[in-house]
Amino acid sequence: MDLGLKGKVALVTAGSQGIGLATAHALAREGALLALCARDAAGLTAAAAAIEAAHGQPVLVLPCDLADETQIGPMVDAVLARYGTVHVLVNNAGGPPPGPSARLTEADWQRAFQLTLMSAVRTTNAVLPAMRAQRWGRIVNVSSYSVKQPIPDLMLSNSLRLAVAGWAKTLAAEVAPDNVLVNTVAPGWTLTDRVGQMLAARAGQRQCEEAAVAAEILAQVPLARFADPAEIADVIVFLASQRASYLTGTVLPVDGGIVQGAL
């Protein structure tokens, strides 16, 4: 299936590892022109080199801390200076730290607000003028199944990702007349470094093996396994494509069936 992404300019935030990196590979495979940003400049450079080697596609590398509002504008300006426009934006960011409400400080909340919600708002606001002018755009937010079913011990993530979903739903209606589509992907448990860290932290708290924690999680997943980041990326790339031309304002779980609700 031709997804109609050849030659489209795609900006992927937090693109040096995990779901972001898998999405970058999938977009490059479709012939998109890539720009990647991440805090870790060395990791970002290595990711870009791997993509270029695998797919023969040049990658614009943009070190950027998404929680710092002063860095997002110049990052997007660099994409526009190189490519002239942006067709696809994948809003992805590392999740906020775990923990119950009693352990969270005001600073924890402020950092999570900037990283999880405002990074998506600011990056989107920076690319929207180009998308609206060309009357074609795809914005895909990478969230979590916690927007459908809160995950214990993830107070910050559960709260702020719901804010992203509400913002995205509202924005989708505002920009639909300009053929800019806004959707959110809600992954389930996926084999990323962040999930590995969460498993290790839970095992440490309970003084048990990580395998026991993983088994407890997978007992709740009908498919009985973790997702590969590439499986999430495939859905993101479809939503970013010409083929997803009548889909906007939705939250799409890609969760192995873990969400128990019917809707």
Question: What residue ranges belong to the model's regions?
Answer:
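Alpha-helical segment proximal to the catalytic Tyr-Lys
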Residues: P129, A173-E174, S245
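Substrate-binding pocket helix/loop in short-chain dehydrogenase/reductase
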Residues: P100-S101, D108-F113, I139, I217
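Short C-terminal tail/terminal secondary-structure segment
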Residues: Q149, V237, T248-L263
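Short, small/polar-rich loop/turn modules that mediate ligand/substrate recognition or access, typified
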Residues: V90, A176, L181, L247-G249
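Conserved glycine-rich cofactor-binding loop
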Residues: V9, A14-G18
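Conserved glycine-rich Rossmann-like NAD(P)H-binding loop of the short-chain dehydrogenase/reductase
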Residues: E30-A46
